[in-house]
Each structure stands twice: as C-alpha cells, then as structure tokens.
Amino acid sequence: MAVRPGLWPALLGIVLTAWLRGSGAQQSATVANPVPGANPDLLPHFLVEPEDVYIVKNKPVLLVCKAVPATQIFFKCNGEWVRQVDHVIERSTDGSSGLPTMEVRINVSRQQVEKVFGLEEYWCQCVAWSSSGTTKSQKAYIRIAYLRKNFEQEPLAKEVSLEQGIVLPCRPPEGIPPAEVEWLRNEDLVDPSLDPNVYITREHSLVVRQARLADTANYTCVAKNIVARRRSASAAVIVYVNGGWSTWTEWSVCSASCGRGWQKRSRSCTNPAPLNGGAFCEGQNVQKTACATLCPVDGSWSPWSKWSACGLDCTHWRSRECSDPAPRNGGEECRGADLDTRNCTSDLCLHTSSGPEDVALYIGLVAVAVCLILLLLVLVLIYCRKKEGLDSDVADSSILTSGFQPVSIKPSKADNPHLLTIQPDLSTTTTTYQGSLCPRQDGPSPKFQLSNGHLLSPLGSGRHTLHHSSPTSEAEDFVSRLSTQNYFRSLPRGTSNMAYGTFNFLGGRLMIPNTGISLLIPPDAIPRGKIYEIYLTLHKPEDVRLPLAGCQTLLSPIVSCGPPGVLLTRPVILAMDHCGEPSPDSWSLRLKKQSCEGSWEDVLHLGEESPSHLYYCQLEAGACYVFTEQLGRFALVGEALSVAATKRLRLLLFAPVACTSLEYNIRVYCLHDTHDALKEVVQLEKQLGGQLIQEPRVLHFKDSYHNLRLSIHDVPSSLWKSKLLVSYQEIPFYHIWNGTQQYLHCTFTLERVNASTSDLACKVWVWQVEGDGQSFNINFNITKDTRFAEMLALESEGGVPALVGPSAFKIPFLIRQKIITSLDPPCSRGADWRTLAQKLHLDSHLSFFASKPSPTAMILNLWEARHFPNGNLGQLAAAVAGLGQPDAGLFTVSEAEC
C-alpha cells in the first residue's frame, strides 16, 4: 500500500512521540530501542555523534550524526525536533556489510542558543531509525564562548631582597571556556620546565622560590581562550641587595715610630655592595686606636771584669756582658768580643826550662801523690766492704720515706747528709761534695773524676775537695770552646727570656722566671765524661715565623732549648704553658719542631702516640710536658675540630699611675692565658708607666668566627666624658685565634671634666659575639689607689734560672735510686712502676714508660717536672710506701716471689 509523500512527516511525528515517551528525552548517552521480535544486530549504530561546541562571536556551529544501518536520522534540540528542511542528509551503503548508511548535518546559530533562558543549557541529540528499532546519540551542548576584559586580580609591583621568595597572584577574567593563564617576563614566556626556580600554582599565581638579580623584570599575566587573549597590567619586580661590610684591613703602622701614636684600619661596603636600592652598611668604615711603639735600645758593654788569676798556661782572662743596657726592641747588638785573654807571669806559671832542683822536687811530689792514692784506695775498699749490704732490699720502708727531705733552690747547707752539690767555674774545675754516699756497684772505684767518675763513690763523711785531673791544655780548650762556639756566642745573655748553665751527668734544671717554662735534665741524660752548656730561650712570635695552616692556632709559647745536635742518653723534659681547653672531641693537637733547614714539622700528634716515637707529651689543664732526646725549637699547635674548641684568654685592665692631663686611658689587654704572655705585658706596662686597676679575668674564646667586642658603660657624665665615637670596639677573630700577635688590646679614652676629678666609677664589658663574656666594675681613685699593684709585684718575683746537680731535684739521689731499683722489675703482686704511675695519675701512656730502659726513672722525672719547687714529698713517699702490704713492707718482696 503506497503512502502519499505529504503524510510522512505526520507519521514520523507520531512514531517519535510514542518512542520518546517510552524511553525519556533527557538521555545524554546513546540509547537503543529495539522493536519486539526484531534482530538487535540491525539496530542503528552511530559512527559519528554530535559533540560539545562553542559559538565564537556570531559564527554558527555544525553538528554531525552518522549511523549504520539507518533509514532515518533526525536532530532534536532542547526537546524540540529540528525541522526536516534544516537537515542536510547524505545516504550511502557500507562497503563491508552492505547496510544502508546515513549522515545528517545541521547548523546551530547564536540566536537559537540565546533564546534559552534560565539555568538550562542548549543541547542537541540525534535519533536514528532502522527496521529493528531506534537509537539515540549522546547530547551535545552548545555554548556561547566569551572572555571578559577585566582581570579579577592583577599582579602588583614588589621589592624583595636577594634570595627572598616572590609570589605574584593572578585571577584571570571570567570566560567560557575558562581561560588558560601564562606569564611573561619582559615579554618573554616563563617556562617552569626550563627554570626550576619558578612554578605556577593552580590558582595561576607565579612563585619564585629564591629571588635572583636576574629576576628583576616586568611581569605580565596573560589569559586566553578560543575567543580572545587578555593581558594584565605589568608588575615591576625589583630584587635588591643590602650592603655588607668587608673584613677589616690590618691595622696600619703606628704613626709614631717611637712612643705613642695612632693606627687605623678600614673596611668597605662591598661584601656585597648595595644594589637596586638596597640599604647601605651600618657602622663606621674606619677605626682608630692608640698605639705605643717601643723605642729601640742599642746594646752597650758592661765594664770589664777583673783579670782572672794567672793560669798554668801563663794566661789570664777577663769578660764583659752586653747588658749596660742590653739590646731590646730591635736595637743593635754590642760589637766586639766578650772575652779577652793575655799572657801573664806568676809563681804558678809553668816555665819551659827546669833546673835539676826542680826535677828532684817534681819526683818527690809524684812519689807522695802515689802513696796518698794507694792509701786512699785501701780505705775505700775497707769502707765499701763494711757497707756492702747497703743496696740490698730494705726491710722497712721507713728507710725509704725518711730520706725524703725538702730541697730548696737556695745554696745547700752543711747539715744535709744526702745533698750533693756541684758549682762549676770556668776558671777551675773544682767540685765540692759533702756527705757519705755509696751506690751498688760490682767493685770499688779507685778514684773519682769529674769526667768519668761514679756519682756515689765511697767517700768519707767529711768535706772533700776534688780537683779535675785533666791536663792544662784541656782546661784551656774548654774555656776557648765556650767563648768561640757559634751557639754560645749568639746567646742573648742577661735577658729575662733566657736561662743557661753548664751541666754534666749529674743533670739539673733551667727555668725562665715568671713564664712557666723550664727544662729538666735528669741524671745520666748527659753522657759521663761530657760537659754541655745548655740554654733555654723564649721567643717572641714576631721573631719566629711559624706557618699555621687552615684553622690552626698557636696554643703555647715558642721555646728553644739547645744547642741542637748534642748527644743525650735519656729524655729531657721541657715544660711550658698552653691556653687550650683540652678535649679530644674539640681539638687536634700537634707538637711542632723546627728542623735544621728552618722548616716546621709535626713531630707528635697527641692522642696517636706510639712507644717508637722519639717524643712524648703529657698534656694537663694548663701546661704540657715534652719528653725529648733531641733539643731544638718547639711549639704546641691546635686545630679546632668543632666550634666547641675553646682557648683561654686572660683579660687585664691597665691605666696610668700618674695622670697629668685631662685625658685618661684605660687599656684592656686580651692575652693567651699563659705566664709568658702576662710577663710580656707587665714589662711593657712598666715601661709605659701603667698600673693594674682590676683583678685579671679569664674568658673562654670559641672557634665560632665571631669577633671580640669591648665596650665601656655607666661613665658618670658629670665627671667624665668618653671620647669613643662608636658604641663598642672590636678585635677581629683571626687576630686572636691565630695566636701570633702580641699585646692585643683596645684603649678607652676618657676626659675629665675638671682637673680635680680623681674618682672613677664605670663598667667595662668584654665579650665574644654569641659567646662568653666578662664584666669589670671599676671603682677607684686614679691618684691614690694601688691595691692591685701587689699582684704585679708577686708576678714579677724572679727565681734561680739554673740549678745544677742534686739541688735541682726534690727527691734525694739515693732515695731515687732505691725506688728505681725496686720498682723497675715487674712484680705479679703489683709492687712495681705501673702501680706507682696509677697512684700518681701518670698512667695515661704506660706504653711509653715501658719502652724506656727505666720506666720508674721516667715517672720520677715527670713528677719532678710537674712539682718543682713546691711538690709535696710526703704525698710521694706515701704513694711509694703504699705499694706493698698494709705493713708497708714493700721492699721485703724478694725477686723469687716476683
């Protein structure tokens, strides 16, 4: 039955209405509605479905649908069918299946979309028919695209410091579709993938993690979509740099070559220099301070001494010293010889020709001498046999302890039976002994000689004077050797920083008064038959170039003992102060020694010693004791391992003793906490006419790279006026930490309002930035107050620089030998040198003591070095006596039991 063409739209409308009621018109996805009983495989299948589109300006958009198999396809927009005349239809046949294919297109204009009001959006959907049923496509939404002109938030100009973060916010204009945002830096696109220092947040803000100088620019936020591209106002970002001070230059040379003057130092605002409007550095770029340059004093000879007695070689001599005055502060040395000899004649002078009478006289004298020697030999043998058991094991330790008697550094008295003294003289070689001493030995010695005799030869109980038996030529050679050897001639005799003396196998001690520096020469350290003139010298840091690497610092004075190259059979002990706070976690300490070529070498790393080392150092809180068999120039150097490494500084305040002007200077010294540094400043202030006005304090200075600051406060303005231009003064960290600069100080100049003002009350603060500090409360009368002068008087007391023989030791020689003989052999019951070391708290390096022929001698030598002259012999005696059983029978233990 044929249907008229005019009826097709009506029939199609009826069918579509019924279908939409059954399936719903708001489905957005493809929906199939098969006819009951039909083949579902022949339902329409969409090859192309309509998609969401935007209308740009007034251009219509095209929607396309394509389905197979399909007999009809119609569009429905917002629930209404699109007129058939608005469809553009193309029919074809699928080449693979032979099924009919249909493609339909429609145009949607801006006016059609704008007719929809409210919240509903304009949408379109395709419906396709086949003999098996219908299928609906997904919905396609048609929106009008736009982008408003005004940004909701624009970036603002900023000024930021270097390495500070930057955030530039941007909220783009409203638009459909939503606008994409990008940033321009001076019209160049910012790409976060190429610059990890920047990124763009989800809210479109531009973030610079750390501002750089290159980030100074104009920044623009750009928003764009398919409709338009909008630019925000440009925001100027300026990255500025605040100025920073460079390090201070070294202090200039004092303006006065001799006496008081000024010196200055400067710094510049270039670390870094201010840029882009950054702040300039605060503070002064120039500092001035008062200085005092010591005037050089040329040396001058003292008067000649009297001529010595005419010697056997028909010569006598006289001497003089370069001490009237001694050269100092760079003055010239005396020129000429210090020793003068000339021929002489006297009864003692030997003549070349002798008559027969002289020959007979000489033969008689020789015969008498031989008889006396034989008689003396017999007496010695008898005496030693009676005393044969003297060196056997002592049955009672009271014999040991009773022998401990205090030894004074004053001349020996005649009532001490254990004291053996030697007083060498360059003109004669006479040695005086007092007492009865007999050591253990295989056989009695036939005679005693200064050059090769035994220390404890059997002598009577009386007083004996023994003359050296060497020929006259040897004595003459000895005198000439002392006057001509280079090291002896170069010694600065008479100075306060040196000690020297003549020593033999008996040993002795050299001390530089008020410095804490001494050299202990134990018995038998000098080979028997040798006589050495040994010196001990304290050097000023500016006179000796000690190279320091990295964070190294000088902790001790630089000390020389010599002459170098002399043969020693036992280690000597060099004692000197140090200013470090010992801590193995904070310091790496090294003992340095200058080689013959002048270079400095690390001869010992403290904490890494081994018994094979030639050197050993006993380090204590304020002093170190160096064992060495090679004399030379030494210094203790430390390298900080952490900021906890600390040096002790001693702070001293000096002011003039007499003040004749209105100005009054307070000098604050910052020294190493060592006796030698204190001595140097005291001597300097005595020359400047200064006095100590406060008790010294100790400040702990850390390796934190922070400077030391000094300031004065609470100065009564009605009486005094401070002339300090800044709030505080600074001593640079490296000037202190290096340790090689002397006389580090700052001067505070006050001016009296009235010449009659004499009372001064103020406060002086000294502190390390972010570290330790000290405060001085000054309250005294500048014309009458001398209460602190006694401290300097005590510090300036001198001592005997050289002690020779047993007078240099606290422990009597015989008792010392008994201790060594008894404690050197190992003992299973603990009565040996190891236990003694523990009792004396010297057991940190037992391996070093064990490597020596006599460990006990090393321990006693160290005890002597640590405790002279004020050591408590009673405590040592108690330690020795306590080694045995409770009955104090230490030496009753036989060798078989050990």
UniProtKB/Swiss-Prot annotation:
Tissue and organ expression note: Restricted to central nervous system.
GO cellular component terms, A-Z: cytosol; membrane raft; neuron projection membrane; neuronal cell body membrane; plasma membrane
Domain TSP type-1: 242-296, 298-350
Cysteines joined through disulfide linkages: 65-126, 77-124, 170-221, 254-291, 258-295, 269-281, 310-344, 314-349, 322-334
Residue ranges constituting the Death domain according to the UniProt record: 817-897
GO MF terms, alphabetically ordered: netrin receptor activity
PTM field: Phosphorylated on cytoplasmic tyrosine residues. Phosphorylated by PKC in vitro. Proteolytically cleaved by caspases during apoptosis. The cleavage does not take place when the receptor is associated with netrin ligand. Its cleavage by caspases is required to induce apoptosis.
Domain named Ig-like C2-type: residues: 155-234
Residue span(s) of domain ZU5: 497-640
Transmembrane regions listed in the UniProt entry: 362-382
Gene3D superfamilies: 2.60.220.30, Death Domain, Fas, Immunoglobulins, Thrombospondin type-1 (TSP1) repeat
Residues in Ig-like domain copies: 44-141
UniProt xrefs under Pfam families: Death, I-set, TSP_1, UPA, ZU5
Subcellular location: Cell membrane; Membrane raft; Cell projection, Neuron projection
Protein name: Netrin receptor UNC5A
